[in-house]
């Protein structure tokens, strides 16, 4: 794994990054291919959409299972001339011993799935931009995937 900054992501940032990574792994890579999927991931960059590909865009929100609403920080997140999708992942926080989704395991699984070193480099750089570097503390944040909805 890679190491770096000592600043840790907070729980909301962890949950948000997990949602973006699930979307990358389960949808974007399968639809667009690895390199294009990674290049379209703009979540760590100062843009209004988390993923954008030609005429498609996707804004990813991840919420705890007990919440009934999402926070949209600006109208630009959903405003566009092109029709896009708001994708909402609903996750339930579990104990660290639960066999669920943790940030470190998700990152490692995605990284290991890439064949090209250049794709691995892009992925690692984007993770660094969002503030993620491997830390065992992230293993304490384990989630059960409940559902994903598209709007």
Segments the model singles out, each with a brief description of its role:
Residues 27, 51-64:
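Conserved catalytic cores of phosphodiester-cleaving nucleases, focusing on short active-site segments
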Residues 1-46, 63-151:
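Nucleic-acid endonuclease domains
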């Amino acid at each position: 794994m890679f190491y770096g900054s000592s600043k840790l992501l907070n729980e909301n940032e962890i949950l948000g990054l997990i949602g973006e990574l699930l979307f990358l792994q389960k949808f974007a890579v399968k639809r667009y291919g690895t390199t294009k999927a990674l290049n379209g991931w703009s979540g760590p960059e100062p843009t209004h959409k988390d993923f954008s590909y030609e005429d498609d865009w996707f804004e990813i929100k991840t919420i705890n299972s007990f919440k009934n609403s999402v926070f949209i920080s600006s109208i630009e997140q959903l405003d566009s001339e092109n029709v896009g999708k708001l994708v909402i992942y609903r996750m339930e926080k579990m104990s660290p011993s639960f066999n669920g989704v943790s940030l470190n395991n998700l990152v490692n699984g995605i990284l290991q799935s890439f064949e090209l070193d250049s794709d691995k480099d892009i992925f690692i750089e984007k993770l660094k931009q969002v503030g993620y570097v491997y830390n065992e503390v992230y293993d304490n944040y384990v989630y059960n995937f409940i559902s994903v909805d598209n709007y």
